[in-house]
């Protein structure tokens, strides 16, 4: 999920910086409120020694320590203010995911791809868990050396963009319409050899912005998109918000519409699509895709 264009996008820098500053202000405000509410209503009759003892017992030695900025937010603020490299999604595209994160964070956020925007996603999900799945081990080393707090897994894909038509045909088979743990799926599109944590976590948001998919020999996002839908359907209850980037390309366009379903699509903004997929385990007999209603009537 590295930068796809060298062009400078100042609006994105402003947006990211503003978002992080808002998070910082909210965090500090909550910390101050919490600190104030934990103090006695009146200290008129307490001696200075008693006040110091009580303050120590409250576990918050000084106001400065209580309101210290989280490392993830300070790292993000410094990085995006000083960096000329901006995330590859536009202001409007990032806004789609941010609105959902504003409602759901802190949450479990799975991101296919590790890149220049990863620190932003982790910061917008402050207090939650953000896991990045990346195919390039050398790239993981570069990014995590700079930001060691980012959590990432190295994975290997066995597909190629040039085989996408065959994989689409395969995906229409009955085996690929069955909902199960991807590790037990009989569909060859399912990703089955990833770390156990990938399958066993209940993901609230999934972003598909990798693996590489801009040339015929690249792995492509066919399996990533299919598996994202399978993880969402196979969760015990609730729903999962799934985002797919680069839907201007044939693979991302066709595979997201087919396996995440047009009926589950909530929004498309630029090259980003947002789907909300409910648990299929919570209601038996739910079709793989919802029945689409002709809105022209």
From Swiss-Prot:
- Tagged with keyword Membrane: yes
Q: Which GO terms describe its molecular function?
A: glucuronoxylan 4-O-methyltransferase activity
In the record, the note on similarity to other proteins reads:
Belongs to the methyltransferase superfamily.
- NCBIfam families, A to Z: A_thal_3515
Coiled-coil spans in chain: none
List, as start-end ranges, the regions of compositional bias called Low complexity.
35-47
The residues the entry assigns to the signal sequence are: none
Q: What does this protein do?
A: Methyltransferase catalyzing 4-O-methylation of glucuronic acid side chains on xylan.
Q: What class of enzyme is it?
A: transferase
Q: What GO cellular component entries does it have?
A: Golgi apparatus; Golgi membrane
Q: What does the record give as EC number?
A: 2.1.1.112
User: Per UniProt, what is the membrane topology?
Assistant: Single-pass membrane protein
**PANTHER family listed in its UniProt record:** OS11G0490100 PROTEIN
Query: Can you tell me where the transmembrane regions are?
Result: 9-29
The chemistry this enzyme catalyses reads: glucuronoxylan D-glucuronate + n S-adenosyl-L-methionine = glucuronoxylan 4-O-methyl-D-glucuronate + n S-adenosyl-L-homocysteine + n H(+)
- Phenotype of the disruptant? No visible phenotype; due to the redundancy with GXM1 and GXM2. Reduced levels of methylated glucuronic acids. Gxm2 and gxm3 double mutants show reduced stem mechanical strength.
Q: Which organism is it from?
A: Arabidopsis thaliana (Mouse-ear cress)
Please identify the protein, giving its name as recorded: Glucuronoxylan 4-O-methyltransferase 3
């Amino acid at each position: 999920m590295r930068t796809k264009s060298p062009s400078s996008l100042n609006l994105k820098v402003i947006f990211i910086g503003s978002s992080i500053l808002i998070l910082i202000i909210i965090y500090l405000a909550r910390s101050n409120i919490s600190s104030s509410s934990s103090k006695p209503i009146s200290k008129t009759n307490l001696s200075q020694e008693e006040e110091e003892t009580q303050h120590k017992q409250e576990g918050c030695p000084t106001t400065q320590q209580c309101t210290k900025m989280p490392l993830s937010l300070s790292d993000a603020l410094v990085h995006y203010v000083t960096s000329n490299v901006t995330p590859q999604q536009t202001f409007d595209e990032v806004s789609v995911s941010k609105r959902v994160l504003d409602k759901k964070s802190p949450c479990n956020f799975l991101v296919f791809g590790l890149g220049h925007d990863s620190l932003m996603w982790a910061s917008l999900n402050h207090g939650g868990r953000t896991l990045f799945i990346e195919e390039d081990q050398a790239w993981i080393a570069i990014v995590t050396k700079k930001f060691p707090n980012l959590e990432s897994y190295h994975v290997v894909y066995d597909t190629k963009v040039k085989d996408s038509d065959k994989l689409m045909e395969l995906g229409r088979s009955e085996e690929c319409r069955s909902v199960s743990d991807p590790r037990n799926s009989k569909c060859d599109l399912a990703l089955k050899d990833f770390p156990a944590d990938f399958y066993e976590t209940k993901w609230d948001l999934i972003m598909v912005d990798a693996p590489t998919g801009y040339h015929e020999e690249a792995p492509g996002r066919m399996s990533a998109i299919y598996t994202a839908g399978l993880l969402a359907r196979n969760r015990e209850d609730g729903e999962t918000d799934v985002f797919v980037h680069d839907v201007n390309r044939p693979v991302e366009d066709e595979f997201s519409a087919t396996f995440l379903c047009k009926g589950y699509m909530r929004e498309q903004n630029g090259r980003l699509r947002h789907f909300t997929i409910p648990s299929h385990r919570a209601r038996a007999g739910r079709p793989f895709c919802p029945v689409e209603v002709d809105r022209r009537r």
